[in-house]
Curated annotation (Swiss-Prot):
Homodimer. The lineage of its organism: Bacteria, Pseudomonadati, Thermodesulfobacteriota, Desulfovibrionia, Desulfovibrionales. NCBIfam families: ribB. GO terms for biological process: riboflavin biosynthetic process. HAMAP family: RibB. Catalyzes the conversion of D-ribulose 5-phosphate to formate and 3,4-dihydroxy-2-butanone 4-phosphate. The gene is ribB. Pathway: Cofactor biosynthesis; riboflavin biosynthesis; 2-hydroxy-3-oxobutyl phosphate from D-ribulose 5-phosphate: step 1/1. It comes from Maridesulfovibrio salexigens (strain ATCC 14822 / DSM 2638 / NCIMB 8403 / VKM B-1763). The record marks H136, E174 as: Essential for catalytic activity. Binds 2 divalent metal cations per subunit. Magnesium or manganese. This is 3,4-dihydroxy-2-butanone 4-phosphate synthase. Its EC number is 4.1.99.12.
Length: 217
């Protein structure tokens, strides 16, 4: 990871805190993982504050596979089974079956329809009947231990929402270049500068959580 590119966002702790503040303000953040892992950056928004414009940005600027990161508890509440019984994906990404809001959508694929689906899923009293399956939103089940258990964007998203004091659910999508290739750190930082979004790493969140745990002990 090129720390020189990230240094403009401060120390690892400062990067996390800037990210938390951005989420509280309803802005997006960009989270990168290790070069030895996926070596990608995800555009992440709070699910509870998500707007149609932000969803449109994710569809336009990212891979198009917009994912809704959920806690174990929320996944169980919604009765969402995993997409496959035996997960053979390289990083054990926790995809459940895809979803669509049962009411308030047309084809389900527009930015507004996908936001409606997200809001239906994260509602406090949401129940399985509120969602149809399959759909155009891809839920991801986060590991209970967060980034301390799995160093993934799913867990990073839920951890950041929790640390920010928001509904723990968030949406993410992998940032891509105009030619369809995956954005790497230089492009991720450039995108962050253009759209006033903090850039941080999964490692930053891991270290932040470890420091918080030490202070609490």
């Amino acid at each position: 990871m090129n720390q020189n590119l990230l240094s403009q966002y401060g120390t690892p702790v400062e990067r996390v805190e800037k990210g938390l503040q951005a989420l509280r303000e309803g802005r997006g953040i960009l989270v990168t993982d290790n070069e030895s892992r996926e070596n990608e950056g995800d555009l992440i928004f709070s699910a509870e504050k998500l707007s149609d414009e932000q969803m449109a940005m994710m569809i336009r600027e990212c891979s198009g596979i917009v994912c809704l990161c959920l806690t174990d508890e929320k996944t169980e509440q919604l009765g969402l089974p995993m997409m496959v019984e035996s997960n053979s994906s390289r990083y054990q990404t926790g995809f459940t079956v895809t979803i669509e809001a049962a009411e308030g959508v047309t084809t389900g694929v527009s930015a507004a329809d996908r936001v409606t689906t997200v809001k239906a899923a994260i509602a406090d009293g949401a129940k399985p009947a509120d969602l149809h399956r399959p759909g155009h939103v891809f839920p991801l089940r986060a590991r209970e231990g967060g980034v301390l258990e799995r160093e993934g964007h799913t867990e990073a998203t839920v951890d950041m929402m929790t640390l920010a004091g928001l509904n723990p659910c968030g949406v993410l999508c992998e940032l891509t270049n105009p030619d369809g290739t995956m954005a790497r750190l230089p492009e991720i930082v450039e995108f962050g500068q253009k759209h006033d979004m903090p850039v941080l790493t999964v490692d930053d969140i891991i270290n932040y959580r470890i420091q918080l745990a030490k202070k609490a002990s």
